[in-house]
Amino acid sequence: MKISSDEIKSKLSELAKEISNYYRHRLADELCIVVPMNGGVPFAVDLLRDITNPGADQIFISYVFDEDENWNFSGSNPKNNSSILIIEDIYDTGETLSNLIDYLHQEYSPSDLQIVVMLDKKIKKHKLVDIGWKGFDVEDTWVYGYGMDDENGTLRQLSYISDEERD
């Protein structure tokens, strides 16, 4: 499987239009962006560049998962009762997204919480999560590129996504 950079760009444009349309009349004053994993940063940056007139200031928030399994945000925390958009690279078992959603609801009581994922892995979900928008369905294989690393922690910098063996 290989998803080319052109296919990614086309899908980003499509997702950005759908997300822009969704938020056009729904936001009061703020849209908080949460990017759970490092692998989602290129997707988030490219997607946010294409989102038009979201109706609010955008706040880019990322997190790290510390040793005690607590969510630690870099930058500022979401504000209570704000709209939150989670931008995730891959939805596989649903554990990470489910835990993050629970945490955000408990700590910040968002007025609206939506999720966009680049990849939806065809795998048995341990936790079902309502995904608002998704880019591509992929098989249950290790994928890398476009921010996601391979088994050796490399190849994040590739402009495409693949699961093919590399020499």
Name these PLM-found stretches.
Residues 1-167:
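PRPP-associated nucleotide enzymes
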